[in-house]
Amino acid sequence: VSRQIIGKYEAATRVPQRDKAAAMDEALATGDALTLLWEQIMDDAHVPPEFRNALMMERRSKHIREYHAILVPGLLQTPDYAITLVRARRVNGPPESIDQVVQTRVERLQKLSDMRPLLWFVVEWVALTRVVGDEKIMREQRRHLIDLMEGGTIQLQVIEDSRHNPGLCGAYRVMSLHDGRTVGFVEDPLGGRSVTKREEIDYLSTLFGMLQSEALSPRSTLERLKELDHA
């Protein structure tokens, strides 16, 4: 690879082929770091820009804590649940772009399986009961959550009584990374923003602990999900 081409790679004005990334890994003795980065960039090509950084941090996490007030968190969504939401928000998007966004969303959990981070979620009761799409989609979504909990993939807690809980805010997550850093991501109607200030991270972490204290235990949450499943 010429010096000029490498300069274009470094300036992000040209994307290398996968074999070039692998060759640079070998030349620089970087293991497969550049190849993995290439795969992440290509996988994320259809992800809205405001979510790309959060997605990269997600893949470097050893512990993810997430709260959602009205929806099932994206990491846990079934394809039908996800496509219903994406279609509702991307009304002007071509069908192929919607399919790509949905595929990226539902593959997120699978891409974390090798690293096995601790995944802990707190959601409001309405996230499990409000109908997204139709009743069949919701039954399949709740069954998916049951399978993830019984398989030990996630810990999930539900807040049944929302009158006095400290949440009632937008969705957010706190991610503890393998390099020792902790970062956050707060969602809003335009996408969201990353959080890196220590005092803001501390606030989000404390708030998550307060939400956990108001929620049912994971075991009780699983029992409530099964009751809904058989209702």
Give residue ranges: language-model regions.
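Short, leucine/isoleucine-rich alpha-helical interaction segments at C-terminal helix-coil junctions
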Residues: G31, L37, I41-D44, L211, ...
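Hydrophobic protein-protein interaction segments
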Residues: H63, Y67-A231
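A short alpha-helix capping/helix-coil boundary motif
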Residues: V1-S2, E50-F51, V122-W125
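Short alpha-helix boundary/capping motifs
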Residues: A23-D25, L34-L37, R52-N53, K62, ...
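Short, flexible segments with low predicted structural confidence
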Residues: I5-I6, H46-V47, M57, R116-P117
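Acidic-residue sensor for enzyme active/binding pockets
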Residues: E10, E58, E187
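Basic, Lys/Arg-rich alpha-helical nucleic-acid-recognition elements, primarily the DNA-binding modules
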Residues: V1-M42
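Short, charged recognition helix plus adjacent turn
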Residues: T35-Y67, C169
